[in-house]
């Protein structure tokens, strides 16, 4: 519940544009997805708080459609379809269909021995994001792109921790916003000084540790 008012306050003071929002499962709420994607044009990268016990028929627990003939085969993500006056749709193609360019034209080559459709390109499934904005994410969960983006979040968290560590801000009991902001800035300055000292000492492997440099 705190995300939307917090971001509204942030954007009212900062004219920044962001492409992705990386959050943990605590932000897994329909209102957050709607706010980020529809109101702010930001792609949410948020894991499910818990996988549905009974996934929608034809989909797996991450909202990815499966092959009608073999539910172990996941359909392949093929981008987002955007048309004026219509909801954005996630395009999925047959897992045994290969997208290629021939003579400057996009074509699909189907290699399935038991196709579920007479179409030469195999089954194509367009899923409106608005049908379930929480499950039908613009970047499919557990895809390589989704996982790589989410890894960035853990790197940022470690960086934030190390920025707070020199002044013990991870255990701060301050309630005053201005005082806390001042301590965070001082901590960032301290961390930068550590980096400069470590670099001058040719000891860059310890740039995040004042204790190790002192030793």
PLM segments and residue spans:
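Active-site beta-loop-alpha junctions of metal-dependent nucleic acid enzymes
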Residues: 1-14
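Short, conserved catalytic/metal-binding motifs centered on acidic residues
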Residues: 3, 18-29, 44, 156-163, ...
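Short gly/pro/ser/thr-enriched loop/turn and capping motifs at secondary-structure boundaries
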Residues: 50-55
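Basic, amphipathic alpha-helical segments enriched in Lys/Arg and hydrophobic/aromatic residues
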Residues: 148-215
